[in-house]
Amino acid sequence: MQNKKIYLIITLLIFIVSISGCSNKKETVKEDLLGINYDTTSNEVELSQYDTTNPVVAMYIENYGSVVIELYPEIAPNTVSNFISLIKTGFYDNNTFHRLIPGFVLQGGDPTGTGTGGPGYTIKGEFAANDFENNLKHEKGIISMARTSASNDTAGSQFFIMLGTAEHLDGQYAAFGKVIDGWTTIENIEKNETIANQNTGQLKNNLTIKKTLIDLKGKEYNEVEKIEE
């Protein structure tokens, strides 16, 4: 009888240890899938591989990975010049994404991380409501400039990536590019990040943009036309 009790206790302990080991293994796999150990230096995207004459941007997001965006200077020339200028000066390096509304937008580019900051100037809004022809639709993957409702010319550095289609934004905001690679990175952010304020989409923890690189494909672009604040 005593030997039977000892056998049962040993069997139970082995079962508990086995379950604990499986649990830890699952957590490790989950972290790997999310890119928790992502290293921008060893996972740098080769931008020359993208067959386009338009500028191509690689944005490296901490804990997730890279997103590649093609810019459309023929659609919104000054908006693209502004984005290029901010990238070349390192403005977006260690900047953040601060806002997420699943199925709608992922927004970033504010140096304060609050949704109220910018580069210290604004640019003219290149969209129909501001007497500028821009027919790029706000569909999934499109990148567009954020602005305040106070004026059409209040965009600066904040931008948003469309997570779905929003026709009511067409003609009201300056769409200027599209995500062409790394959409899995965006999907993982959308699925796994915690939203602190459901009304505004403010993230509990802002996502760091570790580094942003650009390939101009051998072309030169005009200096950005600024509206000084």
Where are these regions (language model features)?
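Cyclophilin-like peptidyl-prolyl cis-trans isomerases
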Residues: 2-3, 7, 18-229
